[in-house]
Swiss-Prot record:
It holds the Pfam family EPSP_synthase. Catalyzes the transfer of the enolpyruvyl moiety of phosphoenolpyruvate (PEP) to the 5-hydroxyl of shikimate-3-phosphate (S3P) to produce enolpyruvyl shikimate-3-phosphate and inorganic phosphate. The active site is at 312 (proton acceptor). Keywords: Amino-acid biosynthesis, Aromatic amino acid biosynthesis, Cytoplasm, Transferase. Its main location: cytoplasm. This is 3-phosphoshikimate 1-carboxyvinyltransferase. Belongs to the EPSP synthase family. Its EC number is 2.5.1.19. Monomer. The gene is aroA. 3-phosphoshikimate binds at residues 20-21, 25, 166, 168, 312, 339. Pathway: Metabolic intermediate biosynthesis; chorismate biosynthesis; chorismate from D-erythrose 4-phosphate and phosphoenolpyruvate: step 6/7.
Length: 427
């Protein structure tokens, strides 16, 4: 598709679609609780719809009237063997977390996904699950999907130090540990997003978190809850950057989730001199209104323990760095290589094709700014975040057209992205 270029300014306010991580987990916990859980403001992107369909296939009744989702929970002991293979679509969250849910189920399942998911390694989940007594096999020595799995009703608890900083792996092991005989200990490499831990407590469960150590006992039961999903900061990130780099812009984003494990991008924007303000802060819902406006930016260094707090925002942060004076270095981000695409290479290739100065490294990128951007053809390779990054980059283009291939990938997490963009262009 041909993208909008030569933006004169972005103005207006947006309510950001529901957080993808919390939407996935609300379906999972709602299914595993006893009673009817209601979820408001859920994200209806393709990944979340995949999770919803999988739990229906496992025997859970889920009603969606377009406003509220109602989940008739069955508990861990009420899940049924599916009649067919479980389709995870493009969703790494779905296949990894649901592997943990199914670890304690005494039936055969096969989980598969699209071409992109079929290239993503699952060994980081399958290795510890095997230690707990699960039979699971995938393709190649990295256990690529499809995965065949038979869980165990007598799962062994685990003491496990995560070799990578991954909220998905941590969450998969937490779901398995909830079904194990005894106490499990999971130790993170770096602190990652804690929505799973928060939701266990919201649904009446218990766990102990001290620093990077999580202790969790098996045999717990959950009680249905009312969940309101805040806006997704990973989706808001595209508008935060657009408001900072497009001339004559001021954007107000309402009801954005500001869980402390997800707000690395706000810290980076402040470090780079961006004009950003938080207001209407709700400490309980962990949400706020965020306002940004066009700013003079300077390069910065991004690495260490901030990386898990902004891993999904690094593509759009890279674009931000191309519009900052001086050098920006991103390091310790090798996890980008096993996302929907190798995001180090694909981001660098896309923005360099448009005139940026980006050198990919083994664990990140070196970006030299400020560079004007020009027209190019860019392929998302099925990665939603590459698509949205390119659409924001196109707004800065004064010379030539930007042709985005496979733009439909954006529907994975933000189906209303282009209509929201139109609103800001004419705000």
């Amino acid at each position: 598709m041909k993208l909008e270029t030569k933006a004169q300014g972005l103005r207006g306010s947006l309510r950001i679609p529901g957080d993808k991580s919390i939407s996935h987990r609300s379906i999972m916990f709602g299914s595993l609780a006893k009673g009817v859980t209601t979820v408001r403001d859920i994200l209806r992107g393709e990944d979340v719809l995949s999770t919803m369909q999988v739990f229906r296939d496992l025997g859970v009744t889920i009603e969606d009237d377009g406003d509220v989702v109602r989940i008739h929970g069955v508990g861990f002991d009420g899940l049924k063997a599916p009649q067919n293979k479980l389709d995870m679509g493009n969703s790494g969250t779905s296949i990894r977390l649901i592997s943990g849910v199914l670890a304690g189920q005494d039936f055969d399942v096969e989980m598969f996904g699209d071409d992109s998911l079929s290239k993503r390694p699952m060994d980081r989940v399958t290795i510890p699950l095997r230690q707990m007594g699960v039979e699971v096999s995938g393709q190649t020595d990295r256990d690529l999907p499809p995965l065949k799995m038979h869980g165990s009703k007598s799962l062994k608890p685990i003491y496990y130090e995560l070799p990578v900083a991954s909220a998905q792996v941590k969450s998969a092991l937490i779901f398995a540990a909830l079904q194990a005989d005894g106490e499990s200990v999971i130790i993170e490499k770096e602190k990652t997003r804690n929505h799973t831990e928060d939701m266990i407590q919201q649904f009446g469960g218990q766990l102990q978190v001290e620093g990077k150590e999580i202790r969790i006992s098996g045999g717990q039961t959950f009680t249905a809850q009312e969940v309101v999903v805040p806006g997704d900061i990973s989706s808001a990130a595209f508008w935060l950057v657009a408001g900072l780099v497009v001339p004559n812009s001021k954007i107000v984003l309402k009801n954005v989730g500001i869980n402390e494990t997800r707000t690395g991008i706000i810290d980076v924007i402040k470090d780079m001199g961006g004009k950003i303000k938080l207001s209407d802060i709700d400490q309980v819902a962990k949400s706020a209104t965020i306002t940004v406006e066009t700013s003079e930016l300077k390069g910065t260094e991004i690495g260490g323990d901030i990386i898990p707090r902004l891993i999904d925002e690094l593509p759009i942060i890279t674009l931000l760095a191309t519009q900052a004076q001086g050098k920006t270095v991103i390091r310790d981000a090798e996890e980008l290589k096993v996302k929907e695409t190798d995001r180090i290479q694909v981001v660098a290739d896309a923005l360099n094709a448009m005139g940026a100065d980006i050198v990919p490294t083994e664990d990140g990128m070196i970006i030299t700014g400020k560079t004007p951007l020009h027209g190019a053809e860019v392929n998302t390779f099925g990665d939603h975040r590459i698509g949205m990054m390119t659409a924001i980059a196109a707004l800065l283009v004064q010379d030539g057209e930007v042709d985005l291939q496979r733009a439909e990938a954006i529907n994975t997490s933000y189906p209303s992205f282009f209509s929201d963009l139109e609103g800001l262009l004419h705000g």
